[in-house]
Design a protein with these regions (language model features):
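A short, hydrophobic C-terminal helix/tail in secreted or cell-surface proteins
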Residues: 253-257
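C-terminal non-catalytic regions of proteins with extracellular/luminal or membrane-system context
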Residues: 1-252
Length: 257
């Protein structure tokens, strides 16, 4: 399993990388924030990996209902998966404190999220110099993340979900408008990042869009995509459709389907 640290070291060398744990995912007794601050002050760039985990720690038992029960005196870093439900989308433990402390050093701050569910990213979207959502990236994920961070691979992924600003917005559907089109008292009603959102190190230009109706139920869509930036890259072209009129099935009295 390649961690993000492993991937970064392969790009540089162990002598050029200073690692500090900082904090745990959930356990607030793990506190190396001051050590992380000192390391950040000695560094040119700060890369912080935060988020969650669904890795079984084998200290957790499960009830017949599937609910997770941690051993007394231990705090599992697992916060996602079967039996692990969340009441908020915030970073757990001291992770938010770690981010804010490192940002105050004034060094360029890159935040990498490892997550199994969309976590709240309001602070990072405003204060971080770069933000990368990697979800659970797999066995070679550390190398893949390092490739993106060091510019050896141009990211082209697009969000498969909408990222909410607050747990109060859930559910956030890309294909369903809110029943009332106005903002909340505290935040905008729009998602922080919409379904299909993503960034690239280059830019693309679309032109010559044509939609040709081949038959009553068949349309052909064509267009040109040009890379107008300085770097090679891949583009995910997205096409969204909706019915102008939708047929409804009217049930008879006492029918359920």
């Amino acid at each position: 399993m390649k961690t993000v640290l492993d991937g970064i070291i392969t790009k540089l060398s162990p002598s050029r990388v200073e690692y500090v744990r900082g904090c745990a995912i959930r356990d607030t007794t793990v506190n190396e924030i001051e050590q992380a601050i000192e390391a950040a002050r000695r560094s040119e760039v700060v890369i912080v990996v935060v988020g969650g985990s669904s890795a079984r720690d084998f200290k957790t038992s499960y009830k017949e209902t599937g609910a997770a029960v941690a051993e007394e005196g231990s705090v599992s870093d697992m916060e996602c998966g079967e039996g692990f439900d969340r009441a908020s989308l915030s970073l757990l433990g001291r992770q938010q404190e770690l981010l804010e402390s490192l940002q105050k050093t004034g060094k360029p701050l890159i935040v990498v999220y490892i997550e199994g569910r969309p976590l709240e990213k309001n602070w990072a979207s405003e204060y971080a110099d770069a933000l990368l959502t990697a979800y659970y990236p797999g066995q070679e994920g550390g190398n893949a993340i390092a490739d993106v961070l060091f510019g050896d691979y141009n990211p082209s992924g697009r969000l498969p979900i909408s990222v909410p600003r607050s747990v109060g917005q859930i559910p956030v559907y890309y294909n369903k408008k809110a029943p009332r089109n106005h903002d909340y008292v505290e935040v905008s009603s729009s998602p922080l990042y919409s379904f299909g959102y993503g960034m690239s190190y280059t830019t693309f230009e679309y032109s010559d869009l044509q939609v040709v109706q081949k038959s009553a139920r068949c349309f052909e869509v064509s267009f040109k995509v040009k890379n107008t930036g300085k770097y090679d890259g891949e583009e995910v072209s997205q096409l969204y459709m909706r019915d102008e009129s939708v047929s409804y099935t009217h049930l008879r009295a006492h029918e359920t389907k």
